């Protein structure tokens, strides 16, 4: 995966359309509007890598706390970096996302991994679900019962679930969407809807403004999933309901523990990439999953 995570899968389908439009003469190669993304992690790295390969200008909108080291990487890839402080008249939410949306309003191309900003990203994201389903079909072992995956903005988990459902249908394993106790807007939204007895998919989606709102002061070692809103929460919600899965919040100590296990096992994943594993570690600790159960954990995001 380009850039050390699944993010390029989401972005490549957007880039494929843009290049196709140029080849068909629908879009001028000589007057390329800049690409734009709000991220300071794997998505930004993947976006800048693809933009460099396509010789396409890109603006990356980042929070002020982005590390200088990561900024150096984006600089080497030719990205224009915009550190986004909160302004006095900003509404709630991530300032980097607000500045990104302003750039799109001015004509930039949303080169993003959030479905509500550019739904084309969801097409490429489903490939990881298809691949996992294919591998499970080849296996002659017991059927995988649960799939654990990290949740930040939600496109990764939602596309994984959709891809599994596309390929495996009613035999798709239960999708477990994992967030940390320091930032869990998706679990909060799902719990609120369940407590209100809202079961219809369309009605749940219509409650967006009531249940999905910015998380105050996100914090976790898994800093790549600190999206204060789960932008693609509807897709993830439908995936867990369709497969009999759940939204799971894990304590921060379990995030740390799971990353330690992954490193000891020889994986080079970051704490973000092992957040799904933290969900399994938690479920084993509380007895929700038997130690001989067959499960899958999707780890995406290399340590840097």
Segments from the language model and where they lie:
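Short glycine/serine/threonine-rich phosphate/pyrophosphate-binding segments
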Residues: 8-14, 37-53, 68-71, 122, ...
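Alpha-helix C-terminal capping segments
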Residues: 16-23, 45-57, 162-168, 278-288
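Active-site-proximal loop->helix
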Residues: 29-34, 43-101, 187-191
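Positively charged, low-complexity intrinsically disordered leader regions
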Residues: 1-28
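Catalytic phosphate/nucleotide-handling subdomain of diverse soluble enzymes
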Residues: 192, 277-304
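A short, small-residue-rich loop immediately preceding and capping a beta-strand
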Residues: 24-50, 54-65, 143-156, 175, ...
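Active-site/ligand-binding-proximal alpha/beta "capping" segment
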Residues: 98-169, 256-262
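Active-site/ligand-binding loops adjacent to catalytic centers
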Residues: 78, 86, 90-113, 166-269
